[in-house]
């Protein structure tokens, strides 16, 4: 139960901050005249209210489009990837990518071994462990962790995780409910790592994702891409 409570706190924290800005913006509109009558309070509250009013718009039209396609080219955003067929008409789609200055054969092993009970996710380990994930990020490639069977669970937490929908060694791994981890060579010395997630076009699912998952997902996934890049470029192999 403690892990569940901590998990919700970690998950909801960033989104609650956004919600507070929305509330502040609403109050700015509703009580604007009252601020004029209470000049002392106005001096304290008006900057916060203005920020609260502006932030949701900035998030919707600037920040959100940026983070949904962080690091990805227009071509990468538009092209089909393995696993797209699992959610053919998504309500929300994110495509994020990073360039790794290492050959694809040196990058793929880091992706292949992701999982709570394997190499971790190369993200904010301390934050994952606040939610009781018991995560440890590997700093080397483990040969014994280089294969996944379709239907196997990739654990995010000791008790939960998505199933493997497809595993194409050296190319892509698709997880149900998450999306695809893909590796695409640029040339002999550099590689693109692409992560795509698709959320079904169902109102309840979309609301849940927007209100609880979207911001933490970006924060953790961005760090994961950077973590893979750092490890592959250092070439830490057994």
Stretches with model-predicted labels:
Residues 2-11, 30-35, 46, 79-80, ...:
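Glycine-rich portal/gate segments that line the openings of hydrophobic small-molecule binding cavities
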Residues 2-31, 39-63:
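Hydrophobic alpha-helical topogenic segments used for membrane insertion/localization
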Residues 52-93:
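Short acidic N-proximal helix/loop "leader" segments that mark the beginning
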Residues 65-74, 182-193, 221:
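Phosphate-binding glycine-rich loops and adjacent basic patches that engage nucleotide phosphates
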Residues 70-71, 94, 104, 120:
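Extracytoplasmic entry segments of secretory-pathway proteins
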Residues 90-92, 156, 220:
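Short, glycine/acidic-rich beta->alpha junctions
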Residues 209, 213-225:
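Short, charged, low-complexity patches
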């Amino acid at each position: 139960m403690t892990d569940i409570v901590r998990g919700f706190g970690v998950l909801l924290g960033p989104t609650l901050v956004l919600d507070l800005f929305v509330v502040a913006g609403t109050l700015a509109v509703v009580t604007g005249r009252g601020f004029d009558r209470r000049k002392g309070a106005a001096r304290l509250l008006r900057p916060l209210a203005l920020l609260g009013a502006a932030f949701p718009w900035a998030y919707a039209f600037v920040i959100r489009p940026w983070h949904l396609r962080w690091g990805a080219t227009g071509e990468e955003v538009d092209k089909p990837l393995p696993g797209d067929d699992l959610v053919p008409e998504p309500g929300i789609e994110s495509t994020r990518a990073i360039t790794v200055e290492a050959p694809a054969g040196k990058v793929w092993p880091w992706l292949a071994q992701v999982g709570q009970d394997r190499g971790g996710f190369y993200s904010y380990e301390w934050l994952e462990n606040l939610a009781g994930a018991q995560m440890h990020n590997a700093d080397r490639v483990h040969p014994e962790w280089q294969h996944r069977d379709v239907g196997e669970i990739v654990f995010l937490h000791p008790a939960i995780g998505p199933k493997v929908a497809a595993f194409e060694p050296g190319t892509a791994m698709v997880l149900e409910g998450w999306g695809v981890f893909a590796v695409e060579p640029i040339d002999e010395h550099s590689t693109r790592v692409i992560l795509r997630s698709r959320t079904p076009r169902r109102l309840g699912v979309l609301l849940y994702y927007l209100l609880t998952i979207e911001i933490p997902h970006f924060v953790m996934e961005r760090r994961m891409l950077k973590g893979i890049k750092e490890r592959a470029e250092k070439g830490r192999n057994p």
